Swiss-Prot record:
Name recorded for this polypeptide: UDP-N-acetylenolpyruvoylglucosamine reductase
Alphabetical list of Gene3D superfamilies matching this protein: 3.30.465.10, UDP-N-acetylenolpyruvoylglucosamine reductase, C-terminal domain, Uridine Diphospho-n-acetylenolpyruvylglucosamine Reductase, domain 2
Source organism: Mycolicibacterium gilvum (strain PYR-GCK) (Mycobacterium gilvum (strain PYR-GCK))
Catalytic activity line of the entry: UDP-N-acetyl-alpha-D-muramate + NADP(+) = UDP-N-acetyl-3-O-(1-carboxyvinyl)-alpha-D-glucosamine + NADPH + H(+)
Family assignment from sequence similarity: Belongs to the MurB family.
Function: Cell wall formation.
Location(s) in or outside the cell: Cytoplasm
Gene Ontology terms: biological process: cell division; cell wall organization; peptidoglycan biosynthetic process; regulation of cell shape
Active-site residues, as the UniProt record annotates them: 165, 242, 341
EC number(s) reported in the record: 1.3.1.98
Disulfide bonds, paired cysteine numbers: none
Gene, per the UniProt record: murB
Pathway involvement of the protein, from the record: Cell wall biogenesis; peptidoglycan biosynthesis
GO cellular component entries: cytosol
Cofactor(s) required for function per UniProt: FAD
Amino acid sequence: MGTSLLGGVPVAENVPLAPLTTLRVGPVARRLVTCVTTDQIVDAVMAAGPEALILAGGSNVVLAGDAADLTVVRLANTRISVDGDVVRAEAGAGWDDVVAASLAHGLGGLECLSGIPGSAGATPVQNVGAYGAEVADTIRRVRLLERGTGSVRWVSPEFLRFGYRTSVLKHSSQWVVLEVEFGLDAAGHSAPVRYRELATELAVEQGERTDPQRVRAAVLELRARKGMVLDAADHDTWSVGSFFTNPVVSRAEFERIAATVGSAVPNYPAEDGVKLAAGWLVEQAGFGKGYPGADAPARLSTKHALALTNRGTATTADVLALARTVRDGVKAAFGIELTPEPVLVGCSL
């Protein structure tokens, strides 16, 4: 009996998805198709139909544990090319490999995003960002497959409507990212170092540019201290990174919170108001690092209170229960409802 195919691509049956995600929870897929070329992705996605799940690095997704009869198309096209100051990455390329390749060619601009797990194709969906930078700063265009029609086209940043940790792609299954192009600094300067903690680590002024290799090294060190660099032996890294986004509140709301707390509230300027540090809110609401304790299957990282981690035996239900407890506790303490950063598939808070 021959191997079954989907869109001309071999199908694996009854495949556990937990090992394919950084949180290491999820269901068993009835069918898994792994595509190593962009053409294979297009053919497999169109053959699989609108209900198929698209999965790449699995670093920013929480999968329902009880999903049944699931077909998954896994993006494993990994080519990275550099032409002058333009870096083009296929969707399945490891994100940190893209950053490293850009720096190897003397290009600055992505170094603040070093060490973020996952794939290049996920970055425009989420408008991935860290340490004062986000991919919207450098994306030139994105190649998309429209699932309803099968058409493939390049789109501009204007089409993508980037926002804080979001884009037009995040809340729609209509589009599949195939490739991403970045326009970088050919002179080899880093992006401006906007984040205070990173500037302190580098001993530079906020807003200053410096050697991007130094920035990368500093970012990787900072991330490692917080358990934000993947390590299979360290359960503090079995997560989706920061589980909640930093909330943006009005100036009046910020002043109300500051008056309630009676001490300095970490904050940052934002277009629509004041951005608060979600990790600080979580800890101030009573959820310290490691909550609720060593015996819990899911708990906050011992290094970073904003990361919800799988201690080795957690299920999706365990992770979501912890997330609800933290979200509701912050709402009770401050009147602010935190928004989850990862994409929740087949489940909700």
